[in-house]
Structures are given as C-alpha cells and as structure tokens.
Amino acid sequence: MTNIRKSHPLFKIINDSFIDLPAPSSISSWWNFGSLLGVCLAVQILTGLFLAMHYTSDTATAFYSVTHICRDVNYGWVLRYLHANGASMFFICLFLHVGRGIYYGSYTFSETWNIGIILLFAVMATAFMGYVLPWGQMSFWGATVITNLLSAIPYIGTTLVEWVWGGFSVDKATLTRFFALHFLLPFIISAMVMVHLLFLHETGSNNPTGIPSDVDMIPFHPYYTIKDILGLVLMLMALLSLVLFAPDLLGDPDNYTPANPLNTPPHIKPEWYFLFAYAILRSIPNKLGGVVALVLSILVLAVIPLLHTSKQRSMTFRPLSQCLFWLLVADLLTLTWIGGQPVEHPFIIIGQLASILYFLIILVLMPLASIAENHLLKW
C-alpha cells in the first residue's frame, strides 16, 4: 500500500510542493523569504478579515470605527497593529526576495520572474488602498494625490480620475470601493502565488552558485522546513517586538487626525515602503513624466532578464557586478530617505541624481559590467 500523501490527489500536490520537493543542497537563508512572504500573506488575510468585521467603510464613521477597534474590541489593538506592521514586514521580505532574485540571477526563470513583478504591483496596489481605509489626514490626501496622477494620462486622464473616485473628489464612493478592492485583492494575490510556485516548480530552485544543481538535490522536508521555521521565528519576533513596543514607529502622526478636505498637511507622503518610488515621481518636474518614471521604477525589473549579458548566472563570482548591486541598494535607501523629506534644496537635486543613478545602474552599468567580466575571464 502506497503512502496516502503520495497517492491521494490533494495530498499529492502538497507533498510534491512542500515535502518531497527536490531542492538544491546549497541554498542559503536568502531563499527563506518566499515562505516568509506566504506567512505574511496569511497573517494579513486573517487579521484583515477580523478587522473587516468591525470596520465601516463610510466617510462619517470609518475613522471612528478604527478607533473603536483599538479601544473597545477584545485585542482589537493587536489586530490593527499586526495588520499595519505586518504590511511593513511584507514589504521588507518582498524587497529582500526581489534583491535575492537580482543578485543570484533567479530572473532567468522568466515566467516565475514576470508573475513576481505582477504580484509586486498587486501587493503595492493593495497596500495603497489599505492605507486609505482609516480615513485619517494622510489617508485622504494620499488617496487624492496618488489617484490624481491618473489625470496626467493624455485625453482620458480627467475622465479616468473621476471614474476611479466615483465622483468629483475623493469621497464616500471612493472609500467604499477601496475597501471592496482591498478585501478582494489578497485572494487574487493568493491565486497568483500558486501560479508563481507552479512555474518555479517546473524549473526547480536556483542556488547561490548559479550552476544547475540537478545532480545534488535534497528533499525539502525536513531540511528546509526546519530552516524556514527558524526564519519564521525570527521574523515573528521582529514583528511582535514592533507591534508590542513601538506600534506607531513606521506610521504617520497625521493619520491620527480625522480626514479634513479643507486642511492640507504640510508634507504629504506615503508609507515608508513607497518612498523610493515617490522620490522618483517627485524628481521629475513634469507630471506625465513623473508618472511614467514611477511606473518604470518597478517595471524596469521586467527588462533585467533581457539585459543579462554575463556568461555566469549569479553574481557570486562577479565582483564588478557585486559593487554595482550594493550601489543600487545604497541608491534605493537614499531614494527612500529623500521621499520622506520636503521638496526643497538640497533634497531636490539629491533625489534627481539618485533617480538617474537608479535607472543608469540597472539599464546601462550592470550590462556593461557583465560584458567587462566576460572579457576578464578570457585573460
């Protein structure tokens, strides 16, 4: 009699994906973030579901329903801060996951990579709409500023903005539809994650050397399940420390003021995980140009596989590319800092230089460094 996990139609899928899955023997902790992202998504869906049971998506009561959750609902404050800081954890894991993909050349799995980019866009859209729901000052003005960017699209822009708003300004209709979409999108993301994994398991995982590891595979369980549990424990410790000791550390104080269309906050800025893209948007004086740069700041990831000129897959043995990669990381941190600063000298010029450098590294310097490394190998 065969083992039920290998014969049962449903268990067999789980077994082939998480138990008997052949995995490279050399993958490091940088490969933990996929499973951590899965946990983050589950935490967000669960906490979000319970928050939605108490939340009201009406402009008159939305802010007070969130206050009610924190004050009157049993452990409502834990749910609220787990959900808010869980989003930050989600993006930390996302950025590290994408960074790992760039460093080790995982982008050569083009289907997996492209679905990952669509997932990144979907998660960013979900987070943006979630930020609007508490209906504080930054929620309202963030929604107004970001949705208003659509008006930069020639010919159909103004109509499109009013269609998204459901009126002539951000109001009740906007809040209601954002709540509906914010609730729906995580389930679409979950389905896309399954497709992401499906394509990954067609090729198998990459490894730090970038060399095919078909000759040296080990079962996912117990080796990588225990390794993933270690990563999970560390992430949960970080998340719970944030939630229980400094829940408002990454938030904006302006969001504790109810939304007021007649009073604009001095500095409108999104959550920290969007600041790098926001800095790129602001560094271009033209509205349409800024919107195009904003979209391209993420979409540029889709071009990386096409610009892979190196004879090696991974950056492990490519010092020039490594230098450029860490320069890119430093540049993104600079952009994140600039995105949170007011639009004045010297922040404007720093933001513009950092934005140029961002695209220059990815589109020009990295492919050139790879060509140089190919020539150095011949010596």
UniProtKB/Swiss-Prot annotation:
It is found in: Mitochondrion inner membrane. Keywords: Electron transport, Heme, Iron, Membrane, Metal-binding, Mitochondrion, Mitochondrion inner membrane, Respiratory chain, Transmembrane, Transmembrane helix, Transport, Ubiquinone. Its cofactor is heme b. Coiled coil: none annotated. It holds the Pfam family Cytochrome_B. It comes from the Eukaryota. A ubiquinone binds at residue 201. Heme b b562 binds at residues 83, 182. Binds 2 heme b groups non-covalently. One of its GO terms (biological process) is mitochondrial electron transport, ubiquinol to cytochrome c. It is a multi-pass membrane protein. Heme b b566 binds at residues 97, 196. PROSITE patterns: CYTB_CTER, CYTB_NTER. The chain crosses the membrane at residues 33-53, 77-98, 113-133, 178-198, 226-246, 288-308, 320-340, 347-367. GO terms for molecular function: metal ion binding; ubiquinol-cytochrome-c reductase activity. One of its GO terms (cellular component) is respiratory chain complex III. The cytochrome bc1 complex contains 11 subunits: 3 respiratory subunits (MT-CYB, CYC1 and UQCRFS1), 2 core proteins (UQCRC1 and UQCRC2) and 6 low-molecular weight proteins (UQCRH/QCR6, UQCRB/QCR7, UQCRQ/QCR8, UQCR10/QCR9, UQCR11/QCR10 and a cleavage product of UQCRFS1). This cytochrome bc1 complex then forms a dimer. Heme 1 (or BL or b562) is low-potential and absorbs at about 562 nm, and heme 2 (or BH or b566) is high-potential and absorbs at about 566 nm. Belongs to the cytochrome b family. Component of the ubiquinol-cytochrome c reductase complex (complex III or cytochrome b-c1 complex) that is part of the mitochondrial respiratory chain. The b-c1 complex mediates electron transfer from ubiquinol to cytochrome c. Contributes to the generation of a proton gradient across the mitochondrial membrane that is then used for ATP synthesis. This is Cytochrome b. It comes from Rhinolophus pumilus (Horseshoe bat). The gene is MT-CYB.
